[in-house]
Regions:
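Core alpha/beta nucleotide-donor-binding catalytic domains of modification enzymes
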Residues: 1-166
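Mid-to-C-terminal catalytic subdomains of enzymes
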Residues: 140-177, 181-184, 188, 283, ...
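Alpha-helix boundary/capping and short turn/kink residues
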Residues: 104, 108, 130, 169-173, ...
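Short secondary-structure boundary micro-motifs
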Residues: 97, 109-110, 126, 169, ...
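Histidine kinase transmitter module recognition
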Residues: 4, 36, 91, 167, ...
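AMP-forming adenylation/ATP pyrophosphatase catalytic core
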Residues: 5, 13-19, 49, 69, ...
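Non-catalytic, surface-exposed connector residues within folded enzymatic/regulatory domains
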Residues: 27, 56, 154, 158, ...
């Protein structure tokens, strides 16, 4: 990336996050990054967990917190004027992500895996496997360090990395690349169906609170979206799945079970699906709507249409 950045007139800054969870080896990794950046003449910003408690919470073991911490650091870098953050995700990470999501339950959106870019973020190494990046380092005479937690099978991703992926590569040595290529195709299909799903939700939106049952009317008046159920029921099931995914994703991980629960709610036409302590979707009298515990305030004396939070 460094020679390419020079050709394109792009200034590089390295960002390293010390999670503080691995003691001496975490400090070793930080020292390694500092040495490499000093030798290559690259500016470096180092973050420690204590600096980011407000954004990421107190340090604790687990992939979710570590990822939240990293992206809190990246957001600070972006806020300081960096144009984009380039992460080091490879095609091997892409293959692991696909297998992990398929095992947990996912649809086309999840099968698209890690996107090559999104606002503020680039993933320039998705076209390479982990073995490719190591080969490049060897060719350039560069060393690397390995996070020892990647060698343990405590995490599901590591078990896939050490078990499922090698087994697949035993069937076809290009398995990692083929899985990553499938993600690219799934992403293109996902984008097309997402446009169809957006059009469906737009056409099904209700606009007049007076014609809606109580709970839906309260939702609409408080700024929550309301949809007529019939257009949703009549659409192609794949388009409906995509539409429901777009409703779940802003609230929580859009696992397949939540999509199925909402699809059943649309089909039955009455009831409620609780996504979190504060957010649920309700259906009654031909409409579907979203409720939030602190926004759907009923007028005094009016009855709720769905069970209380």
């Amino acid at each position: 990336i460094r020679p390419l950045a020079g050709e394109k007139g792009i200034a590089l800054t390295v960002c390293h996050v010390n999670h503080g969870l691995r003691g001496e080896t975490a400090d070793r990794d930080e020292a390694f990054v500092r040495e490499v950046c000093a030798r290559l003449g690259l500016p470096l910003r180092v973050f420690h967990a204590a600096e980011l408690e407000a954004e990421a919470g107190k340090p604790r073991a687990g992939e979710d917190w570590a990822r939240r911490l990293r992206y809190a650091c990246f957001e600070r870098v972006l806020a300081d004027g960096i144009d984009a953050v380039a992460t080091a995700h490879t095609g091997s990470d892409q293959a692991e992500t696909l297998l992990f999501r398929l095992a947990r339950g996912t649809g086309l959106h999840g099968a698209a895996g890690i996107r090559p870019s999104r606002p503020g973020y680039l993933r320039p190494l998705l076209c390479l496997t982990r073995a490719d990046t190591e080969a490049v380092c060897r060719a350039c005479g560069e060393r690397w360090v390995t996070d020892e937690t990647n060698d343990a099978d405590d995490y599901a991703r590591n078990r896939l990395r050490h078990g499922a992926l090698p087994a697949l590569c035993g069937v076809n040595s290009a398995a990692e690349r083929n899985l990553a290529r499938f993600c690219e195709k799934a992403a293109k299909a996902d984008e097309y169906f997402a446009r169809q799903a957006d059009a469906l939700l737009a056409s099904a939106r209700a606009a007049d609170a007076k014609s809606l049952p109580g709970g839906a009317g309260y939702a609409l008046r408080s700024g929550q979206p309301v949809w007529m159920s019939e257009p949703l029921r009549q659409t192609d099931p794949l388009i409906l799945d995509m539409a429901l995914h777009s409703l779940v994703e802003p609230v929580r991980d859009a696992e397949e079970k939540y999509i199925r629960l909402l699809a059943d709610l649309v089909e039955k036409g009455s009831g409620a699906v609780q996504l979190t302590d504060a957010v649920r979707f309700c259906a009654r009298d031909g409409v579907l709507w979203r409720e939030e515990a602190d926004k759907n305030i009923r007028r005094q004396g009016e009855k709720a249409d769905c069970p209380k939070f």
